[in-house]
From Swiss-Prot:
This is Elongation factor P. Signal peptide: none annotated. The lineage of its organism: Bacteria, Bacillati, Bacillota, Clostridia, Eubacteriales. It comes from Clostridium acetobutylicum (strain ATCC 824 / DSM 792 / JCM 1419 / IAM 19013 / LMG 5710 / NBRC 13948 / NRRL B-527 / VKM B-1787 / 2291 / W). One of its GO terms (molecular function) is translation elongation factor activity. The gene is efp. Belongs to the elongation factor P family. One of its GO terms (cellular component) is cytoplasm.
Length: 186
């Protein structure tokens, strides 16, 4: 059992026969009245997002989630295909299931697929990925009074903010959890 006060982003639990993943949460302690936890939950089966408020002492059953490392192969008009390295089985996943991770995945990269009762419901990209910059504005000399950032488009079409000294064609390391530039890769 897990209490509502212990909920964090990414926590998966069962409530009223449904399985939810915490998208966002806020622990509120008002000046008057009892504390509560405001959450934004995504149903892992249907994909529906709801906002729910819990008493911090409320208990719910933690869902048993299986994680499996799989290789991203390719995509077509409607699905993204991943392959299990042990069985060579390929599974198609919809955009809703891969939306947070796909902007950091290139073909043949590995990602963690989350399963609930044998059904895939979510994809996690590796924490750090190295991607090439395909387009960005050139840095202007003298424009360095502070930590100035500029947008850069990566080979996966993700856009991240990078420092002025980073140029098109360079490879950078990106933190996929925050979408932030970490460093240049030599």
């Amino acid at each position: 059992m897990i209490s509502a006060g212990d909920l964090r982003k990414g926590t998966t639990f069962e409530l009223d026969g449904q399985v939810y993943n915490v998208v966002d949460f806020l622990h509120v302690k008002p000046g008057k009245g009892a504390a509560f936890v405001r959450t934004k939950l995504k149903n892992v089966i249907t994909g529906a997002v709801t906002e729910t408020t819990f008493n911090p002492t409320a208990k719910m059953q933690e869902a048993v989630i299986e994680r499996k490392e799989m290789q991203y192969l390719y995509s077509d008009e409607s699905f993204y295909y991943f392959m299990d390295q042990e069985t060579y089985e390929q599974i198609p996943l919809s955009f809703d299931q891969v939306e947070n991770a796909i902007k950091y995945l290139k073909e043949n990269m590995f990602a963690t697929i989350k399963f609930y009762k044998g059904e895939a419901f979510s994809v996690e990209a590796p924490n750090f990925v190295e991607l090439k910059i395909v387009s960005c504005e050139p840095g202007v000399k003298g424009n360095t009074t502070s930590n100035v950032m500029k947008p850069a488009t990566l080979e996966t079409n993700a856009v991240v903010q990078v420092p002025l000294f980073v140029n098109e064609g360079e490879t950078i390391r990106v933190d996929t959890r925050t979408g932030e530039y970490m460093e240049r890769v030599q």
